Amino acid sequence: MKPVKIGVAGPVGSGKTALIDRLAKAMRDRYNLAVITNDVYTYEDAEFLVRSGALPPERIAGVRTGGCPHTAIREDPAANQEAVEAMLARFLDLDILFLESGGDNLAASFSPELVDVWIYVIDVAAGDKIPRKGGPGIEKSHLLVINKIDLAPLVGADLGVMERDTRLKRGSRPWVFTNLKTGEGLDSVVEWIRREVLFEGD
């Protein structure tokens, strides 16, 4: 059985790497995991995951995209496809391969040739108007994660407004509020992966 490839996209600083770090630590005892990260000029996100102990270093790979990060996950995903193939050849028993895009704007989306499903991460610190601005990530991602809910009072963001606008933009598509610093909401993401991506029951 082929591993499921899960893309994780979102603006710079929204919490993409934090989400993968938390997911890896929550799921690694039950599933065989690997991660590929994208950065424009560095391997910073991959190095963070190695330092945090999310997974063994050989299960984490970094891709330097250069230029525009969304090109590397949609229009010209060759470098990522090569990294995916190398990881799959190295670990024949993978259950899940996470692929993190470089930080981008609200227009980013993954090529269906690169991932099976994708998660889009935004954060409350960017303001409560973000969901209503829409875009492929907010409207079309398989799961929307609204992170850093603890910052809402500090930045004057109204979570009720964000919830209303998210429901309007996404319809029946799932979404979740999280505070990845404390792990709040993480269980909902894990459960979504188990039920809706891996098609597992209780």
UniProtKB/Swiss-Prot annotation:
Compartments it resides in: Cytoplasm
Pfam assignment, any one: cobW
Molecular function (Gene Ontology), one example: nickel cation binding
Keyword Nucleotide-binding in record: yes
GO cellular component: cytoplasm
Residues reported to bind GTP: 10-17
GO biological process entries: urea catabolic process
First-listed, main subcellular location of the protein, grouped into a coarse class: cytoplasm
UniProt entry keywords in alphabetical sequence: Chaperone, Cytoplasm, GTP-binding, Nickel insertion, Nucleotide-binding
CDD domains in the cross-refs: UreG
Alphabetical list of InterPro entries matching this protein: CobW/HypB/UreG_nucleotide-bd, P-loop_NTPase, UreG
SUBUNIT field: Homodimer. UreD, UreF and UreG form a complex that acts as a GTP-hydrolysis-dependent molecular chaperone, activating the urease apoprotein by helping to assemble the nickel containing metallocenter of UreC. The UreE protein probably delivers the nickel.
PANTHER family: UREASE ACCESSORY PROTEIN G
Name used for this protein in its record: Urease accessory protein UreG
Primary gene name: ureG
